[in-house]
Regions:
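A residue-level signal for conserved active-site and pocket-lining positions in enzyme catalytic cores
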Residues: 61, 87, 145, 200, ...
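A short glycine-rich, hydrophobically flanked beta-strand micro-motif that places a catalytic Asp/Glu
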Residues: 61, 150, 182-185, 324-332
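Non-catalytic accessory segments adjacent to catalytic cores
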Residues: 44-159, 164-165, 258, 391, ...
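An anion-binding catalytic pocket shared by soluble metabolic enzymes
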Residues: 22, 32-45, 74, 159-240, ...
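Conserved hydrophobic core element of enzyme catalytic domains
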Residues: 281, 285-397
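Short, solvent-exposed loop/turn elements at beta->coil junctions and helix N-caps
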Residues: 8, 186-189, 330-335
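Contiguous alpha-helical scaffold segments within structured protein domains
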Residues: 2-9, 92, 102, 106-125, ...
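Short Lys/Arg-enriched alpha/beta "domain-start" segment
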Residues: 1-55, 156-166
Length: 397
């Protein structure tokens, strides 16, 4: 028997729910970019490495970026699950579904928020040759008749003196505006993303996606911020990089959708540290296709892989130092009525609580006229959202 319950949202509900995230081995958290909708999945009824094998009222999960395998990980190579307990917060109301728990308030009140213990953080890994490898890539792009763009990833790793609570990380993410806040946890493994980029949303057959490519930092003053934004809107390199993504989305959605609408010019999408070129795309989904079909079709966009796709992915697999796992991959949820939403796992971090390490991810779109030093600075900027989550701890670099 499935239990359903709903009521008005109380002031302390979210605190109890955040505390609950630290008490289950398998959980998911999905918060929309406007902060109005928050979805929680606790425990597991069914799980799989492929979403095609799961049919439930709601399924959470994520694909791996590609077919490279991360050794000893049961999360980063792709993971999907139907939660045993589902909670949604939306429009000032809280909704609960479970096959196991009949009294929601009694269940919720057992989870008490506790303070994060002091943690010392020490950087243990940095790709010191990244700029050199990026210069090699730029040289190849200038001498290769086929390869046009490669999104080149970069990683940093930190040793943690103790476990970091998921509840604490989500609280810290609240300062990251205009971004989705997404977490997947499987036992001692946690993937967390504060991503500005939606891959696709489907509701009642209506599809929304967007091209997000081309980045510059926020200004320190209103005038400087506007100046940077104008520079980005008029940057030949960034506009070309952005158009790769727009064209790719248009081509991939043809045949799967009708009423496909793609604006001719991008606008600016601004979040705490960065501003991006942004083109929203809408369409109606053909009934023959599920949201999972569309996710598989769209991934990876040129904002995550490159152009042409096959050659760019081959370069990434050969020249990036470590597999990406869930980094830059689709993460989200879908429902039994073929609705759902997926984001791409950028501005992200992987925490392994078994060995207390945190791996941060960033990437930059490299084209023939890129500058390796500038791209290094851009990736350093893209580490900031996750570095911000670790801010306040003691660093021992």
């Amino acid at each position: 028997m499935k239990y359903h319950f709903s009521r008005g949202l109380r002031d302390d509900d979210k605190q109890h729910l955040l505390a609950a995230l630290d008490c289950f081995d398998i959980v998911a958290y999905f918060e929309t970019s406007n902060g109005k909708k928050k979805l929680f999945g606790f425990g597991v009824k069914e799980q799989s490495q492929s979403p095609k094998e799961l049919k439930g009222d709601i399924v959470f999960g994520g694909y791996a970026f590609d077919d490279q395998v991360i050794a000893n990980s049961k999360l980063m190579n792709g993971f999907w699950f139907i939660p045993s307990i589902f909670v949604a917060i939306n429009d000032g109301k809280i909704r609960f579904e479970s096959d196991e728990i009949s009294d929601f308030d009694q269940w919720l009140m057992q989870f008490l928020f506790s303070k994060q213990k002091a943690v010392t953080i020490r950087r243990t890994f940095e790709e010191k040759d990244w700029q050199s490898r990026t210069r090699n890539l730029i040289n190849k792009l200038n001498n290769d008749a086929i390869l046009e763009k490669v999104v080149f990833g970069r990683q940093q790793q930190y040793a943690l003196s103790a476990k970091i609570k998921m509840s604490y990380l989500i609280q810290k993410m609240a300062s990251q505006d205009n971004t989705y806040h997404v977490i997947l946890k499987r036992h001692d493994e946690i993937f967390i993303s504060a991503t500005p980029e939606r891959l696709v949303k489907v509701t009642g057959g209506n599809l929304k996606t967007a091209a997000v490519a081309g980045t510059i930092r926020r200004g320190k003053t209103v005038y400087e911020d506007k100046e940077f934004g104008e520079y980005l809107l008029n940057s030949v390199k960034n506009k070309r990089e952005h158009q790769y993504v727009v064209n790719n989305i248009f081509q991939k959605l043809q045949g799967m959708t009708t009423n496909l609408n793609v604006p001719k010019q991008p606008i600016l999408l601004k979040n705490k540290q960065m501003q991006h070129l942004y083109t929203p795309v809408t369409a109606d989904v053909n009934t023959a296709y599920s949201i999972v079909d569309i996710v598989q079709r769209l991934h990876p966009t040129p904002a995550l892989g490159g152009v042409p796709q096959i050659q760019a992915l081959e370069y990434i697999q050969t020249h990036e130092q470590s597999p990406r796992g869930l980094f830059a991959a689709p993460i989200g949820y879908y429902t039994a009525d073929n609705s759902g939403e997926f984001v791409v796992g950028i501005r992200s971090m992987y925490i392994n609580q078994m060995v207390n390490t945190a791996t941060l991810f960033a990437g930059a779109g490299i084209v023939s006229d890129s500058d390796a030093t500038q791209e290094f600075q851009e990736t350093s900027l893209k580490f900031k959202p996750m570095r911000q989550l670790l801010k306040g701890y003691t660093y021992d670099d």
